[in-house]
């Protein structure tokens, strides 16, 4: 079954939208002003200043390396040989969360995050003649935050190559990859927009604000309808004390996606800092409403409670998560662990059985078996 509460939640949201009005309607959003940079730099940033990174470009040494990978084989066989070489550590990339790089930079520096690794792999796979595309895994977005507790959005991206023999997923951390999540193919432009946004946030963290803006604006030039990118631009303006521009950026994100909880949370913080408590409370309540109907938010709340030994609270959150979405094995496995900790061994067995029935990833199944073996051996 899917999201059981979707229809009910939609009705409640519509009714709530009629009865709960914004305390004071903010000023209209001006996207052109936000994208000009005038709010922070005093004058518009010229289009000629925007970056044009050669994201998928191959360095000569990359072409040389790939030319020697099963040169006489078919494209999918060449890709398989490339990946086998990675597994045997013929070539390695060290994970760095704050390193969004081009394909050539990733290859030369041998470091990068999931975006950098995926960019490199897509470029390499296509050079070998294999079909390859960017794939967004619809896990709950990763919420980073800067020193002022303003949330920003990162999405998990990997590579998919399809052939008549099936679908091959290439992920920086394939052991943790889980096909239970919805996934969708991204166009190159969609992936590039996320690349530029990531790099913009990295420049922001380093205090290089003009570089940060150039990259964030470039991302929105590619995908002006992406609410995540507007929320990240808002975080940039907030970081620099440009509250009106931050407010408008978050409101633009909400115009594009009325359930964007990160934009809501950032508006709440912004209004609270400005002592506009009525507006702050309004957006806090809106964010709470949507989060508490998100089974993944409930799951992460339950996991946090479990890790802190609050098993009763974990059980309450998991019951709500499973009621809303019962096809995620992790919900059932954690409920099994929680029930076991509470001494409810019969129910724990039921939940563990359900978890294993939903798993279709051998690596996950092995990980669960190891956890259970460890649990049973503990006094």
Predicted regions and their residues:
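Conserved structural position within tetratricopeptide repeats
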Residues: 220-221, 251-255, 285-289, 319-323, ...
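Long, contiguous interaction/recruitment modules in multidomain scaffold/adaptor proteins
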Residues: 94-230, 235, 239-240, 244-258
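Canonical tetratricopeptide repeat
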Residues: 198, 232, 266, 300-301, ...
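Secondary-structure boundary elements
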Residues: 44-104
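Terminal, low-structured helical/coil segments at or just beyond the last alpha-helical repeat
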Residues: 333-379
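TPR alpha-solenoid repeat register
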Residues: 229, 263, 297, 331, ...
């Amino acid at each position: 079954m899917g999201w059981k509460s979707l229809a009910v939640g939609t009705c409640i949201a519509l009714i709530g939208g009629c009865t709960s009005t914004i305390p004071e309607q903010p000023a209209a959003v001006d996207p052109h002003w936000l994208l000009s940079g005038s709010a922070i730099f005093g004058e518009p940033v010229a289009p000629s200043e925007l970056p044009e990174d050669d994201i998928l470009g191959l360095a000569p040494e990359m072409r040389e390396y790939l030319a020697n990978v099963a040169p006489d084989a078919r494209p999918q066989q060449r890709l398989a040989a490339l990946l086998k070489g990675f597994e045997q550590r013929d070539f390695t990339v060290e994970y760095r969360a704050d390193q969004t790089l081009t394909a050539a930079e990733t290859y030369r520096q041998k470091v990068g995050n999931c975006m950098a690794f995926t960019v490199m792999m897509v470029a390499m796979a296509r050079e070998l003649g294999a079909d390859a595309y960017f794939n967004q895994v619809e896990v709950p977005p990763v919420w980073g935050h800067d020193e002022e507790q303003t949330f920003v959005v990162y999405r998990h991206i990997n590579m998919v190559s399809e052939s008549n023999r099936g679908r091959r997923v290439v992920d920086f951390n394939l052991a943790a990859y889980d096909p239970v999540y919805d996934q969708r193919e991204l166009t190159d432009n969609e992936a590039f927009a996320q690349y530029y946004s990531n790099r913009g946030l990295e420049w922001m963290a380093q205090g290089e604000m003009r570089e940060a803006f150039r990259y964030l604006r470039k991302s929105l030039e590619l995908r002006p309808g992406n609410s995540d990118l507007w929320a990240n631009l808002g975080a940039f303006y907030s970081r620099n004390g440009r509250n009106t521009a931050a407010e408008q950026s978050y409101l633009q994100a909400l115009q594009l996606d009325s359930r964007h909880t990160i934009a809501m949370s950032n508006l709440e913080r912004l209004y609270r800092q400005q002592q506009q408590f009525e507006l702050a409370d309004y957006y806090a309540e809106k964010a709470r409403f949507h989060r508490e109907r998100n089974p993944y938010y409930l799951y992460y709340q339950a996991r946090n409670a479990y890790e802190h030994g609050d098993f009763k609270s974990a059980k309450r959150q998991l019951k709500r998560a499973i009621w809303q979405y019962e096809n995620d094995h992790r919900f059932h496995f954690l409920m099994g662990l929680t029930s076991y900790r509470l001494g409810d061994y019969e129910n724990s067995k039921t939940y563990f059985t359900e978890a294993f029935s939903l798993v279709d990833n051998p690596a996950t199944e092995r990980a669960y078996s190891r956890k259970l073996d460890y649990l049973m051996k503990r006094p």
